[in-house]
Amino acid sequence: MSKSHAAYIDYALRRTTNMPVEMMGSDVVRLKDYQHFVARVFLGLDSMHSLLLFHETGVGKTMTTVYILKHLKDIYTNWAIILLVKKALIEDPWINTILRYAPEITKDCIFINYDDQNFRNKFFTNIKTINSKSRICVIIDECHNFISKSLIKEDGKIRPTRSVYNFLSKTIALKNHKMICLSATPIVNSVQEFTMLVNLLRPGSLQHQSLFENKRLVDEKELVSKLGGLCSYIVNNEFSIFDDVEGSASFAKKTVLMRYVNMSKKQEEIYQKAKLAEIKTGISSFRILRRMATTFTFDSFPERQNRDPGEYAQEIATLYNDFKNSLRDREFSKSALDTFKKGELLGGDAIAADISLFTELKEKSVKFIDVCLGILASHGKCLVFEPFVNQSGIEILLLYFKVFGISNIEFSSRTKDTRIKAVAEFNQESNTNGECIKTCVFSSSGGEGISFFSINDIFILDMTWNEASLRQIVGRAIRLNSHVLTPPERRYVNVHFIMARLSNGMPTVDEDLFEIIQNKSKEFVQLFRVFKHTSLEWIHANEKDFSPIDNESGWKTLVSRAIDLSSKKNITNKLIEGTNIWYSNSNRLISINRGFKGVDGRVYDVDGNYLHDMPDNPVIKIHDGKLIYIF
């Protein structure tokens, strides 16, 4: 049915031929062609009530949305605009962008923070105040977070956000309102998020049905046929976050480096105690204590079970103060720092105090040592992602920075009042090379919505639970024109994953999470392909054989058809002759996967999903006695 969708896209474009390509307020910006295209389609089809902007980080989905909001009154006079946004993103980019390019809509905007514990009450209170003659346009920024907060918990409890989700799914189309969902990573943790998002955009279209069988989509064609026009898809980098990507005129080159570091004996000792403590307390599935132990360890492991919280907190504070005091008036000499900046370690002829300090710091954290050395050797500015703020996280890392003489800013929950200004200073043209501020260390608070410019190295100290979060983190630094001020030879970003290892070769929590991420991505890749093939851009580019229409009366019927996956008509079992192979998507063998090569040259993954054809002259490397194909 994509031909039918193509006819409506064509109709919308014909209706909006005179829509300006520039947006003017106190400043002027000219939209990119892809931004102007999606705005024209969404505004040109008044009955297109909802749309997902699946745009990768840094391509301007906020700007696209503000342009749409600015032109809402081209199709109807009275609008109330409700923006559901994370608190950290309300001021920048949303309010700043609106004030700069569309100040006239400010009076119509209502910002509500969906992180607020009173979000539900605030939302419905605001809904009641809206004039009955006004149409509503709802914007859900980083909609994957909103969806995640709307999922029913494992214990069956319904979260407060769910009532807002239910209201929107029932009301938007019924009352002739509009809604735009924005995300660079619309699926983060589970396939259920895809179902939730589809039913928010197209209510009732995807009932309780199993989407996968043996990790393969049951009927991809049915999904694509019924979900046409669901989204706008602007993803220039479809590679895995662990793959290298060549640069372009607008985007910096990305190189991935896996930095494996062996934990010190002290760290290994604490790591094993942390593992045992997780088992005793029943929280081993979260791996929190082990993740913290791979990052930094005090001289002892503070047990938390069966203890007064105040007593436990006091012990942590004492350990922290003892470590902080041990570094008082201590720092590396200029000669040591000069050595580190060359990418070298201290030699036997180094100053004794430098060697002693380095040894002490390394015993407690090989990761922090590795990051500090990497920052000093970097030719430009750096980002460091550390999800933990207190105890063994950012609070400790900043002590390391002080000893190594690394200038920095912090973007975390501790710096809510100063972090926006600090990032602005970090991004200033005068700091392009990191002369004033070398590094920004950020927690999950800085994983979405903010932009960094002229970054050359990102250090990721702790694996997240999913590839989507890693994409968001890396996407803070690789954005459209983010390196325009950087010298041509430095228009690159090295992404360093710091992975801790045990001396006995057993997998650490870092390696466990790496495997979890890879397993999740197998299903997500197939769902992302559905988004791509149902997008306005794909349909417009690939469906040319349609009959033009002169009204949009049939659009609602077209997009309201229920999806039926019961027939499972595309699942067929075939016995293919061939051989088992090993393959990797990286020249540095970041991840090595099992696969299968058929006699016809087609290559499949371990679950039987077709990947691509074997090249005529494949690149092969030998690793641990295995032949590894590089694709």
UniProtKB/Swiss-Prot annotation:
Keywords: ATP-binding, DNA-binding, Hydrolase, Late protein, Nucleotide-binding, Transcription, Virion
UniProt short sequence motif DEAH box, positions renumbered to this chain: 141-144
Record-linked CDD domains: SF2_C (cd18785)
Keyword field contains Mitochondrion: no
Catalytic activity: a ribonucleoside 5'-triphosphate + H2O = a ribonucleoside 5'-diphosphate + phosphate + H(+)
PANTHER family noted in UniProt: SNF2/RAD54 HELICASE FAMILY (PTHR10799)
Protein's name according to its UniProt entry: Nucleoside triphosphatase I
